[in-house]
A protein has these predicted regions:
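A glycine-rich phosphate-binding loop feature that marks nucleotide/adenosyl-phosphate handling sites
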Residues: 10, 140, 187-200, 222-229, ...
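Glycine-rich/acidic phosphate-handling loop/turn and adjacent ATP-lid/helix
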Residues: 230-264, 309-319
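Structured core elements
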Residues: 16-19, 119-121, 136, 222-224, ...
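Intrinsically disordered, low-complexity regulatory tails
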Residues: 8-72, 216-219, 269-272, 280, ...
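Feature representing long, continuous alpha-helical segments
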Residues: 199, 203, 230, 256, ...
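Hydrophobic alpha-helix feature that most strongly marks membrane-spanning transmembrane helices
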Residues: 175, 179, 209-214, 237, ...
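Short, small-residue-biased leader/transition segments that mark boundaries at the very start
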Residues: 2-7
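Active-site helix-to-loop segments that bind/position phosphate- or nucleotide-bearing substrates
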Residues: 38-217, 225, 233-251, 274
Protein backbone atom coordinates (compact mmCIF):
# COMPACT_ATOMS: atom_id res chain seq x y z
CA UNK A 1 0.00 0.00 0.00
CA UNK A 2 1.13 3.58 -0.60
CA UNK A 3 1.50 6.29 2.04
CA UNK A 4 3.21 9.65 2.49
CA UNK A 5 5.96 10.32 4.98
CA UNK A 6 8.43 13.13 5.58
CA UNK A 7 12.03 12.31 4.59
CA UNK A 8 14.13 14.89 6.45
CA UNK A 9 14.44 18.05 4.33
CA UNK A 10 13.09 16.50 1.14
CA UNK A 11 9.47 17.05 2.08
CA UNK A 12 6.72 14.48 1.87
CA UNK A 13 7.34 11.62 -0.50
CA UNK A 14 5.11 8.73 -1.48
CA UNK A 15 6.63 5.42 -0.48
CA UNK A 16 5.39 1.88 -0.85
CA UNK A 17 5.35 -0.46 2.12
CA UNK A 18 5.42 -4.13 1.16
CA UNK A 19 4.80 -6.81 3.77
CA UNK A 20 5.97 -10.28 2.73
CA UNK A 21 4.71 -13.12 4.89
CA UNK A 22 7.21 -15.89 5.68
CA UNK A 23 6.92 -19.05 3.62
CA UNK A 24 6.27 -21.96 5.97
CA UNK A 25 5.85 -24.82 3.50
CA UNK A 26 8.49 -24.16 0.84
CA UNK A 27 12.07 -22.97 0.47
CA UNK A 28 12.79 -19.90 -1.66
CA UNK A 29 15.93 -20.04 -3.80
CA UNK A 30 17.74 -17.23 -5.61
CA UNK A 31 18.37 -17.47 -9.35
CA UNK A 32 21.88 -18.71 -8.63
CA UNK A 33 20.48 -21.46 -6.38
CA UNK A 34 21.58 -19.85 -3.12
CA UNK A 35 19.24 -20.02 -0.12
CA UNK A 36 19.06 -17.39 2.59
CA UNK A 37 17.40 -17.58 6.00
CA UNK A 38 16.30 -14.46 7.82
CA UNK A 39 17.48 -14.50 11.44
CA UNK A 40 16.72 -11.31 13.34
CA UNK A 41 17.72 -8.42 11.08
CA UNK A 42 20.23 -10.45 9.05
CA UNK A 43 19.86 -12.72 6.02
CA UNK A 44 22.28 -15.62 6.35
CA UNK A 45 23.32 -17.74 3.38
CA UNK A 46 22.83 -21.42 4.17
CA UNK A 47 25.33 -24.17 3.54
CA UNK A 48 24.23 -27.26 1.61
CA UNK A 49 23.61 -29.21 4.84
CA UNK A 50 21.72 -26.28 6.40
CA UNK A 51 19.57 -25.94 3.27
CA UNK A 52 18.70 -29.65 3.38
CA UNK A 53 17.72 -29.38 7.05
CA UNK A 54 15.52 -26.39 6.20
CA UNK A 55 13.85 -28.43 3.44
CA UNK A 56 13.17 -31.18 5.97
CA UNK A 57 11.73 -28.65 8.43
CA UNK A 58 9.48 -27.06 5.79
CA UNK A 59 8.23 -30.41 4.49
CA UNK A 60 9.81 -29.87 1.05
CA UNK A 61 12.03 -32.90 1.56
CA UNK A 62 11.12 -35.92 3.71
CA UNK A 63 13.86 -37.75 5.57
CA UNK A 64 11.71 -40.82 6.18
CA UNK A 65 11.22 -41.25 2.40
CA UNK A 66 14.95 -41.26 1.63
CA UNK A 67 16.49 -44.52 0.45
CA UNK A 68 18.96 -46.28 2.76
CA UNK A 69 21.51 -47.27 0.15
CA UNK A 70 23.08 -50.33 1.82
CA UNK A 71 19.91 -51.77 3.37
CA UNK A 72 18.08 -54.82 2.02
CA UNK A 73 14.99 -56.76 3.06
CA UNK A 74 17.28 -59.09 5.05
CA UNK A 75 18.06 -56.15 7.37
CA UNK A 76 14.44 -56.06 8.54
CA UNK A 77 13.37 -57.73 11.78
CA UNK A 78 11.25 -60.89 11.21
CA UNK A 79 9.61 -60.59 14.64
CA UNK A 80 8.37 -57.06 13.97
CA UNK A 81 7.27 -57.97 10.44
CA UNK A 82 5.30 -60.96 11.74
CA UNK A 83 3.65 -58.83 14.41
CA UNK A 84 2.73 -56.22 11.80
CA UNK A 85 1.26 -58.87 9.53
CA UNK A 86 -0.88 -60.12 12.42
CA UNK A 87 -2.05 -56.60 13.22
CA UNK A 88 -3.04 -56.05 9.58
CA UNK A 89 -4.38 -59.58 9.00
CA UNK A 90 -1.83 -60.01 6.23
CA UNK A 91 -0.01 -63.19 5.23
CA UNK A 92 3.76 -63.10 5.61
CA UNK A 93 4.06 -63.82 1.88
CA UNK A 94 2.36 -60.50 1.05
CA UNK A 95 4.02 -58.36 3.73
CA UNK A 96 6.26 -56.82 1.04
CA UNK A 97 3.21 -55.41 -0.74
CA UNK A 98 1.98 -53.85 2.50
CA UNK A 99 5.38 -52.31 3.21
CA UNK A 100 5.43 -50.84 -0.30
CA UNK A 101 1.95 -49.42 0.20
CA UNK A 102 3.00 -47.81 3.48
CA UNK A 103 6.26 -46.37 2.12
CA UNK A 104 8.66 -48.58 4.06
CA UNK A 105 9.87 -50.06 0.76
CA UNK A 106 10.22 -48.33 -2.60
CA UNK A 107 10.74 -50.15 -5.87
CA UNK A 108 13.22 -48.33 -8.09
CA UNK A 109 14.27 -49.72 -11.46
CA UNK A 110 12.69 -53.03 -10.48
CA UNK A 111 14.75 -53.28 -7.28
CA UNK A 112 13.38 -53.16 -3.72
CA UNK A 113 14.90 -50.32 -1.75
CA UNK A 114 14.38 -49.81 1.98
CA UNK A 115 13.50 -46.29 3.10
CA UNK A 116 14.57 -44.57 6.31
CA UNK A 117 11.04 -45.11 7.61
CA UNK A 118 11.36 -48.82 6.82
CA UNK A 119 14.61 -49.09 8.77
CA UNK A 120 13.29 -47.11 11.73
CA UNK A 121 10.08 -49.13 11.93
CA UNK A 122 11.26 -52.61 11.00
CA UNK A 123 15.07 -52.70 11.03
CA UNK A 124 16.81 -55.40 13.06
CA UNK A 125 19.19 -52.74 14.33
CA UNK A 126 18.09 -49.28 13.14
CA UNK A 127 21.19 -47.59 14.60
CA UNK A 128 23.34 -49.54 12.12
CA UNK A 129 22.03 -47.20 9.43
CA UNK A 130 20.63 -44.28 11.46
CA UNK A 131 22.90 -43.93 14.52
CA UNK A 132 20.64 -41.42 16.27
CA UNK A 133 17.63 -43.78 16.29
CA UNK A 134 17.69 -44.54 19.99
CA UNK A 135 16.10 -43.44 23.25
CA UNK A 136 17.95 -42.89 26.52
CA UNK A 137 16.17 -43.00 29.87
CA UNK A 138 17.78 -41.34 32.88
CA UNK A 139 16.43 -41.53 36.44
CA UNK A 140 17.83 -38.98 38.88
CA UNK A 141 17.80 -39.05 42.66
CA UNK A 142 16.38 -35.67 43.60
CA UNK A 143 15.09 -32.71 41.63
CA UNK A 144 18.29 -31.54 39.96
CA UNK A 145 20.83 -32.98 37.55
CA UNK A 146 24.14 -33.44 39.35
CA UNK A 147 27.49 -33.51 37.54
CA UNK A 148 30.99 -34.72 38.31
CA UNK A 149 31.34 -35.92 41.89
CA UNK A 150 27.72 -34.92 42.54
CA UNK A 151 26.28 -37.07 39.76
CA UNK A 152 22.96 -38.52 40.92
CA UNK A 153 21.86 -40.92 38.16
CA UNK A 154 20.28 -44.06 39.63
CA UNK A 155 19.11 -45.65 36.37
CA UNK A 156 20.47 -45.25 32.85
CA UNK A 157 19.09 -47.31 29.96
CA UNK A 158 19.50 -46.95 26.21
CA UNK A 159 17.02 -48.68 23.89
CA UNK A 160 17.87 -49.41 20.24
CA UNK A 161 15.05 -51.36 18.61
CA UNK A 162 12.59 -50.99 15.71
CA UNK A 163 10.14 -48.30 16.80
CA UNK A 164 7.14 -50.53 17.68
CA UNK A 165 9.30 -52.69 19.95
CA UNK A 166 11.20 -49.66 21.24
CA UNK A 167 7.93 -48.08 22.40
CA UNK A 168 6.90 -51.27 24.17
CA UNK A 169 10.26 -51.53 25.94
CA UNK A 170 10.27 -47.85 26.92
CA UNK A 171 6.72 -48.14 28.24
CA UNK A 172 7.85 -50.97 30.54
CA UNK A 173 10.87 -48.96 31.74
CA UNK A 174 8.81 -45.87 32.53
CA UNK A 175 6.05 -47.88 34.20
CA UNK A 176 8.63 -49.56 36.46
CA UNK A 177 9.73 -46.14 37.74
CA UNK A 178 6.27 -44.77 38.50
CA UNK A 179 5.31 -44.45 42.15
CA UNK A 180 1.90 -45.12 43.65
CA UNK A 181 0.54 -43.20 46.62
CA UNK A 182 -2.04 -44.49 49.06
CA UNK A 183 -4.67 -42.36 50.76
CA UNK A 184 -7.32 -43.27 53.30
CA UNK A 185 -10.74 -42.70 51.79
CA UNK A 186 -13.81 -41.53 53.68
CA UNK A 187 -15.15 -45.10 53.74
CA UNK A 188 -12.07 -46.27 55.63
CA UNK A 189 -10.40 -48.03 52.70
CA UNK A 190 -7.02 -47.23 51.18
CA UNK A 191 -7.03 -45.99 47.57
CA UNK A 192 -4.02 -46.05 45.25
CA UNK A 193 -3.19 -43.00 43.16
CA UNK A 194 -0.57 -43.11 40.39
CA UNK A 195 2.13 -40.46 40.32
CA UNK A 196 1.12 -39.34 36.82
CA UNK A 197 -1.81 -40.22 34.55
CA UNK A 198 -0.58 -43.07 32.36
CA UNK A 199 -1.93 -41.54 29.17
CA UNK A 200 0.03 -38.32 29.72
CA UNK A 201 3.49 -39.87 30.06
CA UNK A 202 2.81 -42.54 27.44
CA UNK A 203 1.65 -39.92 24.94
CA UNK A 204 4.76 -37.87 25.71
CA UNK A 205 6.88 -40.90 24.84
CA UNK A 206 4.94 -41.76 21.67
CA UNK A 207 5.01 -38.17 20.39
CA UNK A 208 8.75 -37.88 20.99
CA UNK A 209 9.39 -41.06 18.99
CA UNK A 210 6.86 -40.37 16.22
CA UNK A 211 7.54 -36.72 15.50
CA UNK A 212 11.24 -36.20 16.19
CA UNK A 213 13.51 -34.98 13.42
CA UNK A 214 15.48 -38.09 12.48
CA UNK A 215 17.57 -36.13 9.99
CA UNK A 216 19.52 -34.58 12.88
CA UNK A 217 22.57 -36.77 13.41
CA UNK A 218 24.36 -36.96 16.73
CA UNK A 219 21.19 -36.33 18.75
CA UNK A 220 18.79 -38.82 20.30
CA UNK A 221 15.63 -38.76 22.38
CA UNK A 222 16.23 -38.29 26.10
CA UNK A 223 13.74 -38.92 28.87
CA UNK A 224 14.80 -37.61 32.26
CA UNK A 225 12.87 -38.51 35.38
CA UNK A 226 13.33 -36.52 38.58
CA UNK A 227 11.52 -36.75 41.92
CA UNK A 228 9.18 -33.92 40.91
CA UNK A 229 8.89 -34.16 37.11
CA UNK A 230 9.52 -36.01 33.84
CA UNK A 231 11.22 -34.32 30.88
CA UNK A 232 10.86 -35.59 27.31
CA UNK A 233 13.48 -34.06 24.99
CA UNK A 234 13.07 -34.76 21.27
CA UNK A 235 15.55 -33.52 18.60
CA UNK A 236 14.22 -30.96 16.12
CA UNK A 237 11.96 -27.94 16.32
CA UNK A 238 8.18 -28.26 16.14
CA UNK A 239 7.31 -29.07 12.51
CA UNK A 240 5.95 -26.54 10.02
CA UNK A 241 2.86 -24.68 11.29
CA UNK A 242 2.89 -26.12 14.83
CA UNK A 243 3.98 -23.78 17.62
CA UNK A 244 4.14 -24.00 21.40
CA UNK A 245 1.09 -21.72 21.49
CA UNK A 246 -1.14 -23.72 19.11
CA UNK A 247 0.06 -27.26 19.82
CA UNK A 248 -3.24 -28.18 21.48
CA UNK A 249 -5.28 -27.46 18.36
CA UNK A 250 -2.90 -27.79 15.39
CA UNK A 251 -1.82 -31.06 13.87
CA UNK A 252 1.05 -31.61 11.44
CA UNK A 253 3.09 -34.78 11.11
CA UNK A 254 6.74 -34.49 10.18
CA UNK A 255 6.86 -38.25 9.62
CA UNK A 256 3.50 -39.35 8.16
CA UNK A 257 4.76 -42.82 7.17
CA UNK A 258 6.01 -43.53 10.69
CA UNK A 259 2.82 -42.08 12.18
CA UNK A 260 0.65 -44.26 9.92
CA UNK A 261 2.45 -47.50 10.71
CA UNK A 262 2.56 -46.77 14.46
CA UNK A 263 -1.17 -46.10 14.16
CA UNK A 264 -1.54 -49.57 12.62
CA UNK A 265 0.26 -50.93 15.69
CA UNK A 266 -2.13 -49.03 17.96
CA UNK A 267 0.36 -46.49 19.29
CA UNK A 268 -0.84 -43.39 17.42
CA UNK A 269 -4.47 -42.27 17.10
CA UNK A 270 -3.97 -39.67 14.29
CA UNK A 271 -7.00 -37.70 15.56
CA UNK A 272 -5.12 -34.76 17.12
CA UNK A 273 -6.54 -35.76 20.49
CA UNK A 274 -3.32 -36.75 22.23
CA UNK A 275 -1.99 -33.37 23.35
CA UNK A 276 -5.48 -32.19 24.31
CA UNK A 277 -5.95 -35.23 26.50
CA UNK A 278 -2.58 -34.72 28.20
CA UNK A 279 -3.87 -31.34 29.40
CA UNK A 280 -7.22 -32.84 30.45
CA UNK A 281 -5.72 -35.81 32.30
CA UNK A 282 -3.17 -33.68 34.14
CA UNK A 283 -5.97 -31.37 35.26
CA UNK A 284 -8.11 -34.33 36.37
CA UNK A 285 -5.18 -35.49 38.52
CA UNK A 286 -4.95 -31.98 40.03
CA UNK A 287 -1.49 -31.55 38.52
CA UNK A 288 0.01 -28.55 36.77
CA UNK A 289 -0.56 -28.26 33.00
CA UNK A 290 2.11 -29.79 30.75
CA UNK A 291 4.84 -27.38 29.69
CA UNK A 292 6.04 -27.37 26.06
CA UNK A 293 9.14 -25.45 25.01
CA UNK A 294 11.86 -25.44 22.33
CA UNK A 295 15.25 -25.30 24.06
CA UNK A 296 18.03 -25.22 21.51
CA UNK A 297 17.10 -27.33 18.52
CA UNK A 298 14.74 -29.57 20.50
CA UNK A 299 11.13 -29.93 21.60
CA UNK A 300 10.67 -30.46 25.32
CA UNK A 301 7.64 -31.62 27.29
CA UNK A 302 7.69 -31.38 31.08
CA UNK A 303 5.13 -33.16 33.27
CA UNK A 304 5.20 -32.16 36.94
CA UNK A 305 3.86 -34.23 39.81
CA UNK A 306 2.71 -32.94 43.20
CA UNK A 307 5.36 -34.57 45.37
CA UNK A 308 6.11 -31.26 47.12
CA UNK A 309 2.47 -30.86 48.14
CA UNK A 310 2.29 -34.49 49.28
CA UNK A 311 5.42 -34.03 51.41
CA UNK A 312 3.98 -30.89 52.96
CA UNK A 313 0.74 -32.64 53.84
CA UNK A 314 2.66 -35.57 55.31
CA UNK A 315 4.70 -33.20 57.47
CA UNK A 316 1.53 -31.48 58.67
CA UNK A 317 0.04 -34.86 59.62
CA UNK A 318 3.15 -35.74 61.65
CA UNK A 319 3.13 -32.36 63.41
CA UNK A 320 -0.55 -32.70 64.26
CA UNK A 321 0.11 -36.07 65.89
CA UNK A 322 2.82 -34.70 68.16
Amino acid sequence: MGSEMCIRDRGYLTVMLVHVKPSLNRVIKMKDGKIYLRIGDHSNQLTVDEAIRLEYARGVRSFEEQIVEDATFDDLDPETLTLYGEKMNTEVSTIRDLLCARGAIRVKDGVERITCAGILLFGKMPTQFIPCARVRFLRYDGTHEGVGGMINIVKDEVVELPLPRLLLRMKDILASQMREFQTLDEDGTFKKHPEYPEFAWLEGLVNAVTHRDYSISGEYIRIKMFDDRIEFLSPGKLPNIVTVENIRTTRYSRNPVIARVLSDFGWVKELNEGVKRIYIDMENFFLEPPVYSEPGNNVQLVLKNNIAMRSMRRLEEIINRI
